[in-house]
Amino acid sequence: MELPVPSLKDVKWSSASFPLDLLVSSYRLPQLVRVDCAGENVEGLRENDCLLIHSCRQWTTITAHSLEEGHYVIGPKIEIPVHYGGQFKLLEQDRDIKEPVQYFNSVEEVAKAFPERVYVMEEITFNVKVASGECNEDTEVYNITLCTGDELTLMGQAEILYAKTSKEKSRLNTIFKKIGKLNSISKLGKGKMPCLICMNHRTNESISLPFQCKGRFSTRSPLEIQMQEGEHTIRNIVEKTRLPVNVTVPSPPPRNSYDLHFIREGHRYKFVNIQTKTVVVCFALHTNKIVPMHFPLHLSVPKFSLPENLIKGEVWQDSVVQHWYNICQEQFDIEEYSRAVRDVKADWSEECKSPKKNWSAGHSHIPNSLSYARDELTQSFHRLSVCVYGNNLHGNSEVNLHGCRDLCGDWAAFPQDSPQYQDSCDSGSDYLFSETSEELTSLPAKPELPYEELWLEQGSVKRSGQPLTRSQSEKNKCDSFRGSLPSRCGTSSLPSPGALLTTKSLDVSLPPPPVPPKSEAVKEECRLLNAPPVPPRSSKPSSPTPSVPPAAENIVRQQTRSPSPTLSYYSSGLHSIGITESETTSSSDNSQVSCYPCNWMKNESSDLESNLTCGSASSEALPSRLSWPNRYCGGAEGLNVNDLPMDQCRSYYSYPRQKTPGTPKKNSPATFDFGGCGSFTGCNQGEFSDTVPGCPKSASYSLESATDRMLGDNSTKQSLSCPALPPRAPKPSEGNALSEPLSLPMKIDGAEEEIQTCSPDFLEEHYLAKKGVQDIFSISYPFSSPLHMQLAPRSCGDGSPWQPPTDLSGLSVEEVSKSLRFIGLSEDVVSFFVSEKIDGNLLVQLTEEILSEDFKLSKLQVKKLLQFINGWRPKM
């Protein structure tokens, strides 16, 4: 006998009220809630109204304005979903009037006009033999390949040395051949070739195009030119043209019963920009009717209260939710509701910002030195939708934010997320969109496939061995089982604040965005640069970059430094801050799955919570360094000494340079206290917790360096010339021996943090380890310098003395640092050389004037360094 469904009047509600983002991230949907505080701006809602929270969805819409003749914008802004089924025809664009389309037949013509950007209209291949130098006979063939549609942002001009072909000197060869001196005077002919330096956005690489290169270029994309004819969907227009763009409605559009703005035949619109936002779709359960509505995820009002039975975990709550869910499913089509055309609500303008954009790694880690290129990217909205948004271009994707946050305001992984709560339907309803993916996704080749599958195929991540994404058709198969979710996933009571300390996971592994690597031709051009490139036109940060939420403002720091006046833009290293492609791949493999509004990773085991037993961790303990290519970022995970891959090193180029804004050119390193009783709290010998309550946000370099330094004597295989990878997450069995948290007292920018005492056993052990290191290397270096500079003087790390080679031109940046320490130069000099990325090739070209005026070296230091470059070596 079935029990009758309880009435909403019989539900007892809790006294506490919470905003939507807390509810959605804490409980699986659907759920019943009651309005506690409706606020003034929420139409159709009153206090004590009951709502069914249906689902959390990501909507991608195009903001548009109505147009009058003459391209005047009128009326309110509207939002057109990317899946809108109507067709549009492109009009004459405003930019076509202001900047008529130009066509060029060679690079030289492009350089004379020097527009902001050009597009390649046909495939171009060009070969040039580049000479290594005036006195060097080495040459290298530089192959240029440009594909149709490549977008090139112009950056400047320069000259490179090239090897003349035999035809150019054939007459001279004939003369010398007659007099028998061809072999003695047959040196390679060289000439200077002017080049146009561009950024190719397809390859994300800077290239040098010789003026001699022939080919068709245009200031309009060939795709955009093709789009001028015919009718196109809004998605097609956004992907292939550069917004803003003017369109007209050539034929009667389809109708949607949920449309709040009616698009009619003959209307004109200006597509302004793209917006991706996360909304919560709800149903207001009035006594006489049910009204669908939606809210942006981060509205402060309305606030809602939960049923007490949900907190207690009573089973009958399942039947109430299922009853109203079935009614809403029968009466309303959520997919159609999500694709409706609406007016933009002015009161939600600030609140509707996409959580994905606010927390996107690609947007929050753009160095100022590359902002000119990113500025061009963000102004081109078709690339914004395809490349920068990545898998964000969803017209109607359901998102599951459950398990990210508790109702006390702290992020946590709930017991409901353990494997025992996962079943075939349950896992299928998880829509987690990785925040760490920076891959450039290509245009879909098979439009007949479901749109969500196309965009998530490359970046799909698996959790618990099951796919996290699926098509809409697959999602519908599980709708009939949705009623079992509340009882299965909403039965556990909220964790207490004390228990939250054991469940925190603050790991954020966000690799920096890909930056253009230095091509071989540019390397050659930089060595003998006759005319330095014109500096970028836009040195300001890109304006369209979304604002960073308050929680991330202290974490994200844009770092840059002005290049030395005598070094070119490329030699100064501003172009080479990012990570290589292979490291990007490895980092994306290791990066945890995350969803907004939290960043959390899968639990290795459901009992990981019991591993961490102490700490005063807070949300303020988020590290400032978000660019480790693996999982360790200083979160509340166990750190095992044995897990450190001591025999593996990362190159210096794997990590961006860490410089805080406003620091002088010469580093003034902060001190790191390894002595005294204030260094570490009581820990076991093998492992310790890395929860750092007293560590400032800017101390991540020092914290990670301290780990490497303390463990340096455990493995002689670890080369001190490059940092060891940070520790990986512990296995469940390794976390049982954790004791009190580690506290690292540091001085960062003059700010002194609290010092905790430590156990005598650990102190004695640590002192002996420290003393052994000091006996071997005799000099301690401050840890505020970058990791690759923490090198022992005159040592390779395996005990053998560092011996610089006779030819210094082939040294890497790390080896140049070793060489400078080898001849006894101070640490601030070494750090300045590293910050300028001086390798051996640049080192041997430094003159006395550059060293004294630009590098600010003393006369003695200049003399010693020049003698060292010329072959002098100190006696060991």
From Swiss-Prot:
Keywords: Mitogen, Phosphoprotein. Residues 9-318 are annotated as: CABIT. One of its GO terms (biological process) is positive regulation of cell division. Residues 461-471, 556-569 have a biased composition (Polar residues). Residues 811-876 form the SAM domain. The modification Phosphotyrosine is found at Y451. Gene3D superfamilies: Transcription Factor, Ets-1 (1.10.150.50). SUPFAM superfamilies: SAM/Pointed domain. GO terms for molecular function: proline-rich region binding. Residues 460-569, 708-741 are annotated as: Disordered. It comes from the Eukaryota. It holds the Pfam family CABIT. Residues 532-549 have a biased composition (Pro residues). Adapter protein that may provide a link between cell surface epidermal growth factor receptor and the MAPK/ERK signaling pathway. May promote cell proliferation. Belongs to the GAREM family. This is GRB2-associated and regulator of MAPK protein.
